UniProtKB/Swiss-Prot annotation:
GO terms for cellular component: host cell membrane; membrane. InterPro entries: DnaJ_domain, J_dom_sf, Papo_T_antigen, Papo_T_antigensf. The modification Phosphotyrosine is found at residues 250, 315, 322. Residues 416-421 are extracellular. The lineage of its organism: Viruses, Monodnaviria, Shotokuvirae, Cossaviricota, Papovaviricetes. This is Middle T antigen. It is a single-pass membrane protein. Gene3D superfamilies: DnaJ domain (1.10.287.110), Small t-antigen, unique domain (1.20.120.1860). It is found in: Host membrane. Disulfide bonds: none annotated. Keywords: Early protein, Host membrane, Host-virus interaction, Membrane, Oncogene, Phosphoprotein, Transmembrane, Transmembrane helix. Residues 1-394 are cytoplasmic. The keyword Transmembrane helix applies. The NPTY motif is required for interaction with host Shc1 protein.
Length: 421
């Protein structure tokens, strides 16, 4: 972006767009300002023909120069397609539709931590992989925004605070033409949809009022009240728009409908139920309208069947076997104290706190930590062995030099005595 247009043309374009200088490079806001100024400066609307022509010329040059930034690097080798200027109207959000924010970042906490090595195929991780490929294939030591559209280049250009960086970066990429990102839209992460057979056979029936993810709640979809017909069980690791930061309601938590109350009370007696057929989760979540029971539980022959009486079964005594299997001393499990969120936290910080608390009970993470500890101990032992070998070589060299010095002194004394006699 620093090499797009001259300094005078930059100032003139920003003056015509009526934007501050710090927004230079924000394609979405510049395009929105261009559309507004085009309506004001159009000759049919009473505007100036000269100013309109100058604005169109500078804006067209700006888009062409941004398009050529990565093309001038050469040797990228991973471009999927390159269209002409007529195909630049298709933005990234228009390409992926209403599920753009779900496909933009699969798991915020994991995708933000795995900077160098990630097998994720969301838009955030794919753009980071492009950054490394551009450095390797194009021998580009320093990349700026325009040559690369990854999160790090975005933060380096705009200096965005960490609190809202992912939300602002998602909006920045959403308005960017998909052709400029060199992304294969078929390889981008796409949540799989559940088939109708799996949805009917599932024990937990997801209501049709679960809504979209938190970042889609402020879009034109009715603040997340329109449900997703795919029936995909959404995870709570979702993003959130900056406009929702002032209202700390976690709309990412979903309202589920379960089988009748008596079944739930037998399986989970600690669950709090508010009506006869609907399970209500904890309070900090958006209140969705409830679906009528006749839509949740259609009448069928299986519902009319009476529950069979349970018969008591006799089991063989296996106390001795259990004593052999169980360890002699039980290892105490350290349960970390719950993380209590402070007042005034954004939903994004609340999600991270819940993920951190969940990580203490994740068996995969525990196994990974044990492997890291073993690897660290092996490296420490290897470094100790290497230090001992280096010390042995040093002692051997010192001994050799001392022996050589002694031989030289003996020869010197013998030669001196022979000359004396």
């Amino acid at each position: 972006m620093d090499r797009v247009l001259s300094r005078a043309d930059k100032e003139r374009l920003l003056e015509l767009l009526k934007l501050p200088r710090q927004l230079w490079g924000d394609f979405g806001r510049m395009q929105q300002a261009y559309k507004q100024q085009s309506l004001l400066l159009h000759p049919d609307k009473g505007g100036s023909h000269a100013l309109m022509q100058e604005l169109n010329s500078l804006w067209g040059t700006f888009k062409t120069e941004v398009y050529n930034l990565r093309m001038n690097l050469g040797g990228t080798g991973f471009q999927v397609r390159r269209l002409h200027a007529d195909g630049w109207n298709l933005s990234t959000k228009d390409t992926f539709g209403d599920r753009y924010y779900q496909r933009f970042c699969r798991m915020p906490l994991t995708c933000l931590v795995n900077v160098k090595y990630s097998s994720c195929s969301c838009i955030l991780c794919l753009l980071r992989k492009q950054h490394r490929e551009l450095k390797d294939k194009c021998d580009a030591r320093c990349l700026v925004l325009g040559e690369c559209f990854c999160l790090e280049c975005y933060m380096q250009w705009f200096g965005t605070p960490t609190r809202d960086v992912l939300n602002l970066y998602a909006d920045f990429i959403a308005s960017m033409p998909i052709d400029w990102l060199d992304l294969d839209v078929h390889s981008v992460y796409n949540p799989r949809t559940r088939s109708e057979e799996l949805r009917r056979a599932a024990t937990v029936h997801y209501t049709m009022t679960t809504g979209h993810s938190a970042m889609e709640a402020s879009t034109s979809q009715g603040n997340g009240m329109i449900s997703s017909e795919s029936g995909t069980p959404a995870i709570s690791r979702r993003l959130r728009l900056p406009s929702l930061l002032s209202n700390p309601t976690y709309s990412v938590m979903r309202s589920h409908s379960f089988p009748p109350t008596r079944v739930l009370q037998q399986i989970h007696p600690h669950i709090l139920l508010e009506d006869d057929e609907t399970l209500v989760l904890l309070s900090p979540m958006t209140a969705y309208p409830r679906t009528p029971p006749e839509l949740l539980y259609p009448e069928s022959d299986q519902d009319q069947l009476e529950p069979l009486e349970e018969e008591e079964e006799e089991y063989m005594p296996m106390e001795d076997l259990y004593l052999d299997i169980l360890p002699e001393e039980q290892v105490p499990q350290l349960i970390p104290p719950p993380i209590i969120p402070r007042a005034g936290l954004s939903p994004w910080e609340g999600l991270i706190l819940r993920d951190l608390q969940r990580a203490h009970f994740d068996p995969i993470l525990e196994a990974s930590q044990r492997m890291r500890a073993t690897h660290r101990a092996a490296l420490r032992a290897h470094s100790m062995q290497r230090h001992l070998r280096r010390l042995g070589r040093t002692l051997l060299l010192v001994t050799f030099l001392a022996a050589l010095l002694g031989i030289c002194l003996m020869l010197f004394i013998l030669i001196k005595r022979s000359r004396h006699f």
